[in-house]
Amino acid sequence: MILVWGNSLQGQEVSRGRLGILLGGMNGVSYDYALTDHLEVGGTAAFVLGLGYGGSSKSFQFDGLTPLLELAPRYYFSRREEGQSFNKGGYLSLRLGAQIDDWRLFPSKAGQESNVKSHYTLGMAPTFGWSFPLSSKSYLRLGIGLLFYRAKKSHAGDSYYAGQSYWVTTQRLSDAPFLLDIGYGIAL
């Protein structure tokens, strides 16, 4: 009985891990591992494109590329088909990330001249999205979520508070910024 069960498992074994390249809102490398036909865990090392809409300035803002490490379990509503490289369809995800704001590339002029410096940010974002396979080796992923964060900041310049650091966190649900995820992935 055990030998038959063991042989049937070996016959069904498919590659569950996938190394890839991400382009879009996050630009870097990812590794996704399918735990089941519905559940996968993804890890990402990337540069995040700092785009946003300023509520007070009523304008779009660019704030450079920030290094990010992210872990994101995703539950797909549709079942992963045999031989398919990517899950497709709707998913729920809990994205956990850490970004190092001090290492930002191409920071905005406003960010460089600001008296408040951001050092690093820890975030959690429940996300709903949709994944579209474009070919056997690529996909397009679109998602939206709410970002809950905790950021380490400090005062700079010649002010009385210069050098003092403090934490900024999401205080209320209404303060949580929307997280838009638009990404193109290619399996290696």
Write out the residue ranges for each language-model feature.
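Mid-chain, structured segments of secreted extracytoplasmic proteins
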Residues: K58-Q99
